[in-house]
Amino acid sequence: TPEDFARHLKMGYVAAQLGTRFIATPECRASDAYKQAIVAASAGDIVHTERLTGVPVAVIRNAFIERYGTRAGPFARWMLRGHRRKHWMRAFYTLRSVRGLRGSLASESANGYWQAGMSVGGIDSIQPAAQIVRQYAAALSAEGVVAA
């Protein structure tokens, strides 16, 4: 939330990653189903999967993720453990993930993976990006945080 953002910066954090919040905007090219999934999700709906890139990635739990699983298979785990092999496995995962992500972004069905962070619990509507930026700026001002 904007308030959490301002509070963390006041505590000494130097930055925040707000990618999930900006998916739920009219400006984002993601499907309406993806945006609505973000609005409907809570932090408990976020799981980490290593099956997309070989390293844990946060996604919204849905029927596809339940069916597909979150752990790499035995061969992939063996590949990922090897100093030289892991690069090949990650390249394979990345190429496959890019293709899958394109489909998931455009799809109106939940038959894919939708990346999202734990902040989904603080997102309750689809808003224009400019409005979100104004809300975050107002929260900074209310907390007395001066941007450097």
Residue ranges and their predicted role:
Residues 2-148:
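Conserved active-site-proximal phosphate/metal-binding subdomains
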